[in-house]
Amino acid sequence: LNKSVNKWLLPLALIMVIAFIFAGCSTNSTPTTTTSSATTPTTTTPLLTGSFKIIGSNTVTPLSAVWAEDFMKANSKVSIAVSGPGSGVGIASLIDGTTDICQSSRLITQSEIDQAKAKGVNVYQIQVATDALSVVVNPANPISELTITQLSAIYTGKITNWKELGGKDATIVVMSRDTNSGTYTYFKEAVVQMAELPTKDTKLEYGNKVLMLPSTEEGVSQVASNPNAIFYAGLGYLNNTVKAIGIKKTANDPAIKPSVETALAGTYPISRPLLYYTNGAPTGVIKAYIDFCLSATGQQEVLAAGFVPLKK
């Protein structure tokens, strides 16, 4: 009997071992989204590839350049080209289909949206940061604060001498970004046309003696070397060669200086959104890039660049 039992037990044991081995193989053959070790690459994050262009705002360009550099370091098969000829050029490029992302320091107009629709472009807006637009003078200038009404008078040409504002007897050298700039448009709407705050006078325009400059960098440089100059620039462009003055919404309001803190608190009178525009909701590598810009890491870059991160 023992011989008979042994005769059947051995083959049965072999069958069970083989079945166990095959069962193990079957379990491992199903794809999973987790990794078996720290050195095995995950199957859930596909390799990002592709190239795209970002064109537009001179103000947003330094921020986009940092984001693009970081994103390309993390994704070696991605190429991003960033240029900053102005928000108007960026919006025109989006409408014409010559850029993938328009970076803008102003809101797109209804007229531009209509032009885009006529060309089959579905404008999609994403706010990526906030800016506190700063009014700067030379550090030697004794003026430390101005009202919106006074700023409007300076830029329309009603006030032409610093002594009219309690300063030195010297002609004010008034400088602005050029008409392609979103900052030019925003400052006109938020300051120049707000002489009788809160009423907006759309007939008011920049005075004919205002010097129009092609870049923010040039304006800051001019103010640094000219004690009688005034200019406006994004918060990220401030440095110790110029002085940002406090802005009073009205004569009875306190003067508020531009900073991340005052912009986040909503107390600084000249704050604005910084925007990306795409043709339809972003997808693929462009969506991955914008998701990075909006991530905690991307918003830390906003702060490091001197702009205001989005509230979470």
Please annotate each region the language model reported.
Residues 20-24:
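C-terminal motif of bacterial Sec signal peptides marking the signal peptidase cleavage site
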Residues 1-2, 27:
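N-terminal acidic, proline/glycine-rich, low-complexity intrinsically disordered segments
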Residues 26-312:
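Exported/periplasmic ABC-transporter solute-binding proteins
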Residues 11-13, 299-300:
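Short linear motifs in low-complexity, proline-biased tails and propeptides
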Residues 14-18:
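Hydrophobic helical h-region of N-terminal Sec-dependent signal peptides
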Residues 2-12:
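Bacterial N-terminal signal peptides that target proteins for export
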